[in-house]
Amino acid sequence: MGSLKEELLKAIWHAFTALDQDHSGKVSKSQLKVLSHNLCTVLKVPHDPVALEEHFRDDDEGPVSNQGYMPYLNRFILEKVQDNFDKIEFNRMCWTLCVKKNLTKNPLLITEEDAFKIWVIFNFLSEDKYPLIIVSEEIEYLLKKLTEAMGGGWQQEQFEHYKINFDDSKNGLSAWELIELIGNGQFSKGMDRQTVSMAINEVFNELILDVLKQGYMMKKGHRRKNWTERWFVLKPNIISYYVSEDLKDKKGDILLDENCCVESLPDKDGKKCLFLVKCFDKTFEISASDKKKKQEWIQAIHSTIHLLKLGSPPPHKEARQRRKELRKKQLAEQEELERQMKELQAANESKQQELEAVRKKLEEAASRAAEEEKKRLQTQVELQARFSTELEREKLIRQQMEEQVAQKSSELEQYLQRVRELEDMYLKLQEALEDERQARQDEETVRKLQARLLEEESSKRAELEKWHLEQQQAIQTTEAEKQELENQRVLKEQALQEAMEQLEQLELERKQALEQYEEVKKKLEMATNKTKSWKDKVAHHEGLIRLIEPGSKNPHLITNWGPAAFTEAELEEREKNWKEKKTTE
């Protein structure tokens, strides 16, 4: 019922749109009354003018909407429709209302009757959305059907070219554009009017009148058992047979249901290509013109009975429904894809905005980075200059330090040299001291020797003086004794001479001892001077290597060369020794 209602609404929409003169979506009440009356008449629905007046009591015009004509149409007409009206009459009534306003004035290769059939086919194949259009897939399906019915070859490349231009302009064709497309012969070149008209009629019978198969066959009568040629028309639940193909004189129907069956019969009584259609109360024996026709009819009837068992619609309606569901699915997928694309676009825009914000931030960051880089470069240049200065200064300091290290090394070497020299000086001082000590010992020995010699000389001198005195005394003695004394004198003179010689020898030895003493004294002075010189050098070097520290509180003797290397007691001892030496000399 829902599918029937949708098909009826499409034709009514054309009629209502034709009555809408100013395209406002509204039609006057008087026109709606006429339309409603005509609809009730062709649809065999009781007409209630009071309900119409009541429905549009406050409106001069009624738009086709939920608030306008549609609620009345649904409630008082469409809900009461039964499947007992003439669909062709209904469609022709709606066609009559809209054809004059919409059909093109350009000359067409088809008749108005053919245009009407195309219009009805359009309503069957169009989408369930308003305004009604037929999409490219259904146009291709219809054109293929027509080309097949005309016995021509389908030009897919030509349609693809047309489809490209078609898709670029709009989503589909209106009924009048479809009529003009078929009527101008674009896809039926080389075909005459009659062939095109027959093809349109064949497709109309299949799609609109649900004619599954039709053709001439022989039928055996039930009463007289004779064979008569009839025009058979197979529909989803019935096989009708007529005197001729003009369908004016109907001779009977074969009602089909799920209990019917079709069987092939062998040839008999001179009749060939026989088959049997068994129904609940009757059996129909039919003869086809040839085996191919026989097989086609058996297959068609068998398929029809099978569809009745399954409760399925006719193949063309089922195919249309599948195509619609496929398009609906594709549309849903496309809408889902578009929704996803919109979401992706929104996300992309959001990402773009984020990227733009990030780009701006990056630009700002780049600007800041450039500024920072500039500052960094400037700072780097400054740091480099400062580092260069620091490096130069460090090099200078390093050079100075190296010079200082070299100087310190030189000073250390000099210090070590002075230490070595000082050690040598100490050794030489010790040698000088040893020489001085030895000289003192030699001086002491010489002095003792000199003292001994002086003592011996004094003793000899005293002895000589004694002898001289004795000699003088002897002179004063007697002359007698003088000779004796002379002799003694001679002896004594000899002894004196010997003593004088000894004295001279002692004097010589004393002089030699004195010379030796002078030499020793000179050596002592030289040793003393040498010792003093080495002591001064040692003191000088000790002063160079001595750490600076608080001086001693004890008083020191000061010489021409600085502090003395000996104490006051040592000085007194030396003065005492010197005086003794002077006294001895």
Curated annotation (Swiss-Prot):
Subcellular compartments: Cytoplasm; Cell membrane; Nucleus; Cell projection, Lamellipodium
Q: In which tissues is it expressed?
A: Expressed only in mature B-cells including those associated with mucosa-associated tissue and bronchus-associated tissue. Widely expressed. Abundant in spleen, and fairly abundant in kidney, lung and liver. Also found in monocytes and macrophages.
Coiled-coil residues are 316-539
User: What are the entry keywords?
Assistant: Cell membrane, Cell projection, Coiled coil, Cytoplasm, Cytoskeleton, DNA-binding, Membrane, Nucleus, Phosphoprotein
Q: How is it modified after translation?
A: Tyrosine-phosphorylated.
The terms describing its cellular component in GO are: actin cytoskeleton; cytoplasm; cytosol; lamellipodium; nucleus; plasma membrane; postsynapse
Please provide the Gene Ontology terms (biological process) for this protein.
actin filament bundle assembly; isotype switching; negative regulation of actin filament depolymerization; negative regulation of cell-cell adhesion mediated by integrin; positive regulation of actin filament bundle assembly; positive regulation of cytosolic calcium ion concentration; positive regulation of mast cell chemotaxis; regulation of protein localization
The UniProt GO MF terms for this protein read: ATP binding; cadherin binding; calcium ion binding; DNA binding; guanyl-nucleotide exchange factor activity
- PH domain location: 210-306
Q: How does the record describe its quaternary structure?
A: The SWAP complex consists of NPM1, NCL, PARP1 and SWAP70.
General function of this protein: Phosphatidylinositol 3,4,5-trisphosphate-dependent guanine nucleotide exchange factor (GEF) which, independently of RAS, transduces signals from tyrosine kinase receptors to RAC. It also mediates signaling of membrane ruffling. Regulates the actin cytoskeleton as an effector or adapter protein in response to agonist stimulated phosphatidylinositol (3,4)-bisphosphate production and cell protrusion.
Q: Which PANTHER family match?
A: SWAP-70 RECOMBINASE, SWITCH-ASSOCIATED PROTEIN 70
Entry text on domains: The PH domain is essential for phosphatidylinositol 3,4,5-trisphosphate binding.
Q: What is this protein called?
A: Switch-associated protein 70
Report the gene name: SWAP70
